[in-house]
Amino acid sequence: MTMTSLSESLEASDPSKSAFLEFSHGYQSHQQHSPGVSHAHYPVHGLHQGAHSQYDAAFSPGAASYSRPLAYHYSTAHHHPGAYLPYQHNSAVGYSRVEDADSEKQSSIESGEIRLNGKGKKIRKPRTIYSSLQLQALNQRFQQTQYLALPERADLAAKLGLTQTQVKIWFQNKRSKYKKIMKHGSSGPEGEHLQAASASGAPCSPGMPPLWDVSMPSKGAPIHSGGYMNSFGHWYSGHHQDPMARTQMM
């Protein structure tokens, strides 16, 4: 047996070497087919590159000039007018409420009382200051009658330069003051004035009972201060003289 035949038999009998040769042959065949596969990817890459170029061209600074609009469209020229209607309606309602509040405030002032924003504590108007001539005429008319009819009140207000409301309020206050004096009695100038008015006996005025008939019952006997001093004067004088006599004796 020669050396060449021995080497061929060893190569044929070695399974690992034959497997290595088959693997290397398969790898070479795979490399031969792989360039085609790699070239098949180039068109896809070019397609993506073209899409990116179109996207970049759409948003490039040159494309974003004033002559050409952007990719998204937004128009500010067309607006629905109804979007501003609620605000205008609310403003009109608020103005009407202000007018209503002013009218209510005016009505409350005319009635003789002022309120703070229509709520809270009442604030009365300042009292009317009457002149001496007006007071004299009102007192004379009150001596004649305590109640005025509507024509009489209008005539008296026109003569004195007052309003009918002022005349009516003055007569109301005068009647309430007169009733209070009649109930509790009076010794002041107002009571004397009313007594003189009742004594005059005006035909239109109702009969007024005299105020001086009211008598207050006496409570207990009157106490004289002199009696107190007299009862203790003798004891005080004797007690005062006794120490003086003792000092003289010493």
Curated annotation (Swiss-Prot):
Main localization (coarse): nucleus
GO biological process, one term: tissue development
Disordered as annotated region, ranges: 182-202
Compartments, as annotated in UniProt: Nucleus
Entry keywords, A to Z: Developmental protein, DNA-binding, Homeobox, Nucleus
Extent of the signal sequence: none
Gene3D superfamilies recorded: Homeodomain-like
InterPro entries according to UniProt: Distal-less_Homeobox_TF, HD, HD_metazoa, Homeobox_CS, Homeodomain-like_sf, HTH_motif
SMART domains: HOX
Entries under Pfam families matching the protein: Homeodomain
GO cellular component, one term: nucleus
DNA-binding region(s) from the entry: 123-182
MF-aspect GO terms: DNA-binding transcription factor activity, RNA polymerase II-specific; RNA polymerase II cis-regulatory region sequence-specific DNA binding
Family listed: Belongs to the distal-less homeobox family.
PANTHER family registered for this protein in UniProt: DISTAL-LESS HOMEOBOX 4 (PTHR24327:SF86), HOMEOBOX PROTEIN (PTHR24327)
Protein name per the record: Homeobox protein Dlx4a
Species this chain originates from: Danio rerio
